[in-house]
Curated annotation (Swiss-Prot):
Leading EC class: hydrolase
Subunit composition and interactions: Heterooligomer composed of large and small subunits.
Catalytic activity: Exonucleolytic cleavage in either 5'- to 3'- or 3'- to 5'-direction to yield nucleoside 5'-phosphates
Entry's localization field: Cytoplasm
GO molecular function: exodeoxyribonuclease VII activity; nucleic acid binding
A biological process from GO: DNA catabolic process
Gene Ontology cellular component annotations, sorted alphabetically: cytoplasm; exodeoxyribonuclease VII complex
HAMAP family named in the record: Exonuc_7_L (MF_00378)
Job of this protein: Bidirectionally degrades single-stranded DNA into large acid-insoluble oligonucleotides, which are then degraded further into small acid-soluble oligonucleotides.
Record key words, sorted: Cytoplasm, Exonuclease, Hydrolase, Nuclease
Lineage: Bacteria, Pseudomonadati, Pseudomonadota, Gammaproteobacteria, Enterobacterales
Official protein name in the record: Exodeoxyribonuclease 7 large subunit
EC number: 3.1.11.6
Classification via Pfam families: Exonuc_VII_L, tRNA_anti_2
Amino acid sequence: MLPSQSPAIFTVSRLNQTVRLLLEHEMGQVWISGEISNFTQPASGHWYFTLKDDTAQVRCAMFRNSNRRVTFRPQHGQQVLVRANITLYEPRGDYQIIVESMQPAGEGLLQQKYEQLKAKLQAEGLFDQQYKKTLPSPAHCVGVITSKTGAALHDILHVLKRRDPSLPVIIYPTAVQGDDAPGQIVRAIELANQRNECDVLIVGRGGGSLEDLWSFNDERVARAIFASLIPVVSAVGHETDVTIADFVADLRAPTPSAAAEVVSRNQQELLRQVQSAQQRLEMAMDYYLANRTRRFTQIHHRLQQQHPQLRLARQQTMLERLQKRMSFALENQLKRAGQQQQRLTRQLVQQNPQSRIHRAQTRIQQLEYRLAETLRAQLSATRERFGNAVTHLEAVSPLSTLARGYSVTSAADGALLKQVKQVKVGETLTTRLGDGVVISEVSAVTKTRKSRKKTSNP
């Protein structure tokens, strides 16, 4: 009898795929320490080996694009530290490791600590560019924190003596390797800040292995460099060696000698610059003096040309020339004025106003006579037209018509009577005659019939 709910049934392929996804997603990337065995490298360039310890082993693969970054040749039995992803090879169901990076076991553990501390300090902002202090230019005093017996101090002092022998140097001796080295380096940095004798610090040592340089990967040293009020130049190992101190320092120099180059002035270069400036100054002075001499010569020549005696002679000559021109111009002007006077006299005689006045008076008398005659004729004609108009008006005047026996009758409202239908019995009428007005009352109204005209047939 079957149960009420059947369990999930996996195919082999689905099972291997599910396990692979669980391993990749849940485990992610891990660090593994172990011993190499069964190392092989086929023609593809990939590495295949087993990583084991005393009680267990696991198959590993490192592909060509990853193993080309490994700086050593893995050997059978070698202890290594690998960074890898856990997965499952589905066709065979084999659980295996895909290696991304590999280091010898001792250096590998240190490198892992290095990466962890680097990530931590970077997250806190100790590497940010905004906190980097500017180095003094030029430096007036240099502090060196390193071993008093190491090659790094010798290199630094040699470069400073060659480049800037007058630059003061204060040495803060300290161990640079061993368990006590980080604490001594921190105390030296703090002492330099307390004494405040120098304006830049060089912190470093010569080259060595990762273990030899490990003091400069110490968190205490990194925080002391970051807290320093004096700018710090890190100079640890060779150019390929990069420590935590290099990230925190205000400037990283690839070597101690390079750090000395950075903080010092090149006296020989300064001397060459001074000599070059002196040459430019001499050339400028020569040019200036030559220019002033040429200017003096020009001014002297102009001064000679403008000597008072020469100027007086030129002005005297100019005065005589102007005097001659003025005399000649005056004579010509007087001559032209005389000729003009003669022409005007002749014109005045020809245009004497007496004759013109006589002719004008005669003309005025003639015009006055003609005007009087014209006015008399127009007045006579006007009187005649006025008399005719008066006679005509009297002929057509209503008063003249009334004087001939006619009358005009009007009703009480002033309307002229033209027909009997306008009059009513008992109504008062006003009749105007030639010599007065008659007021009458209507006693009867009789309408006269009009006679019809007979029309004869043609």
